[in-house]
Regions:
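Transition segments tied to proteolytic processing and entry into folded domains
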Residues: 6-11, 42-43, 47, 67-70, ...
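Second-shell loop/turn segments in exported
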Residues: 19-22, 54-58
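Short alpha-helical scaffolding segments that buttress acidic/His motifs in well-ordered protein cores
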Residues: 32-36
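Cysteine-centered nucleophilic/redox motifs
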Residues: 57-84
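Alpha-helix initiation and capping sites
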Residues: 26, 58-62, 66, 105, ...
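His-Asp-centered catalytic microenvironments across diverse enzyme cores
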Residues: 2-24, 41, 82, 86-198
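Short, conserved helix/loop micro-motifs enriched in His/Cys and acidic residues
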Residues: 39-56
Length: 198
């Protein structure tokens, strides 16, 4: 979903984030969102610190969207950061089927962050096109940028435990398979600008 669904307003360069974007020649919110969208996927050196996205030139669904939510807040605008959990499968995340199938699974619960503005879900880390979109979230909640670390991980693990229990599966094994899926995705050459978190 494109940056065009986000509000557009001038960034205040007197504020810390506005100043960082201004130093890159970026003075409007949508331009900032487009810039962040084009940065490659990659875990930051501290995956819970969205402040590292611009300096490290990469980010994940959590760090990129948290940065943009905070940038909006800094400028007195409300753009929500949402944590969702969905069933990751080969259809919505090409490349994970090769890990899931040998483990007897069709899907595993995965956490994903995106932005919400005036009823629109805006995901700047997944490819455009419906075939790779997440069509249904099993859990969604608005979070603050500082919650993308431990809090997000705990929500995700708690959800995986419950999901596994409901299906008579081993939660530890399920989490291990999920980690293998993420590794398989990270190894894909086209992965760099596509999606993901961890």
């Amino acid at each position: 979903m494109s940056a065009g669904r986000l509000p557009d307003f001038a960034l205040d360069a007197a504020h810390p984030l506005g100043g960082r974007f201004a130093s890159l020649g970026i003075r409007a919110y949508r331009d900032a969102a487009s810039h962040v969208h084009l940065l490659p996927y990659g875990r930051n050196s501290d995956r819970s610190d969205w402040r590292l996205v611009l300096g490290e030139g990469r980010g994940t669904c959590s760090t990129k969207h948290a940065l943009l939510a905070e940038l909006a807040h800094e400028n007195g605008r409300r753009v929500a950061l949402v944590l969702g959990v969905y069933e990751m499968d080969e259809a919505n995340t090409p490349g994970v089927g090769a890990v899931l199938k040998p483990n007897g699974l069709r899907s595993v619960p995965e956490a994903h962050c995106y932005l919400a503005y005036e009823g629109a879900h805006v995901d700047l880390t997944r490819q455009e096109g419906e075939e790779c979109q997440i069509l249904r979230f099993l859990h969604e909640e608005e979070i603050e940028p500082h919650q993308i670390g431990e809090y997000k991980l705990e929500v995700h693990k708690r959800f995986v435990r419950r999901w596994a229990e409901e299906r008579g599966l081993d939660a530890v094994h399920l989490w291990r398979v999920r980690e293998e899926c993420i590794s398989a995705l990270a190894d894909q050459p086209q992965f760099g600008r596509r999606l993901w978190e961890g």
